[in-house]
Amino acid sequence: MSERKSNSKAKNTAKKAVKKAYKKNPKAFIIGAIALVLVIAISVAVIYFAFPETWDSIMAMITTNNGGDPDDNGGSNGDSLERGDGELQIHFIDVGQGDCILILFPDGKEMLIDSANYNDDGEIEKRTLDYLDTYITDDQIDYLMVTHGDSDHTYFVNEVIEAYDVDTIYMPFILAEPSNETLQAQVNALEKSKLDMFTDKDTISTKVYAEFFISALSEPDATIVLNIGQFSIETATYRFDFYCYAQEDWANTNLSSAEKKNAISPIGVLEYNGKRIVLTGDSNEINEPMFIEAVGGTGLDCDVLKVGHHGSETSSTREFLDFINCEYAVISCNAEGNTFLHPRQNTLDRLRADNMTLYRTDLHGTVVLVVDANGTLTFTTEKTTTADIWMGADTAQNQG
């Protein structure tokens, strides 16, 4: 049970005890209550007049905690959000082995996180762009994020930027240095003030990252935000908190392995009407503990997890799952013919041990999550399946 749920249970127990005491002896209960109020009032008066500095410290503490329990880790002042009267939609688009997440916020804004298929499949690309056109009807995207430089997250992004006007682009703190001379010349021709933002020593030499990089920095009037530290997209009714590598983490990291390249993925927590959705990119055992440390407390009671790195064995660690305490999981993957053998059996077993409800794009197609005005979660899937959703790609191959 999470700390938040434990606190709630404790409060309910206390309420029951008060009611029981009142029923047993109403007169004594009332006299005792009045006496307690008088004692508290006298104590407050003494502190206020005799110890003004102590009073100021107490008031500052109350203001800082926003009246809440600092150990009840509800995110960034989670209780301060107003209830929204619209729908939040999150579309986990089936792109095979890759990621593409379209978020439709209740205020009419949109966000796209990654857009790619590992094999740069032209048919999947067209289908994905057609899908986006169905929901983005004003030729404009408010927020676009690329979590990291892998091709199965970036292949279609330059086409998206060409097709839509993008207001804000969130991207890795990594300079493109393509081996292709023509592309390198295009990188060199980009606005110097934008290129100067990329001071980290790491670079990416792939063609696909260079094409995205050039498109992003060439997008007219787009604000470029680097995935560094913590930042939020916030309104009165929803908040999207992102936890990324801090500046010193970037400085102390070299992208010498696939695991290190994946670990730069931001972990985002989107909250609306009392529900929290965790989006992870290809996060893994390297940056998941960093997220836990950054959030702090004993846990962050969440509802839905987009499983990191397509269900890789090194993602969704036991510690991470215990910390976020989700009831639902979504995996974007293509188990059939997938040389990476994602999702892995060990990862699925960890999710199953938590009694999660699981959705997989390889079996269910595109998965759409809706949080409505009442805070109710609903999932719809493109297709149904009779396959064993808890069988990993590695297990299926072994049974082959």
Question: Where does each model-flagged region fall?
Answer:
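Active-site metal-binding motif and surrounding structural segment of the metallo-beta-lactamase
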Residues: 106-111, 118-179, 294-312, 325-330
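Metal-dependent catalytic neighborhoods of phosphoester/phosphodiester hydrolases
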Residues: 151-163, 179-191, 317-321, 343-345
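Core dinuclear metal-dependent hydrolase active-site scaffold
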Residues: 32, 51-140, 214-301, 365-400
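Long, structured stretches of catalytic cores involved in phosphate-ester chemistry, encompassing
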Residues: 184, 296-366
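Gram-positive cell-envelope targeting signals
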Residues: 1-79, 169, 369
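Surface-exposed intrinsically disordered loops and tails
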Residues: 181-225, 249-254, 290
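Active-site environment of divalent metal-dependent phosphoester hydrolases
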Residues: 97-99, 149-155, 176-179, 284-290, ...
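Charged, glycine-enriched surface loops/patches
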Residues: 195-199, 207, 211-217, 344-376
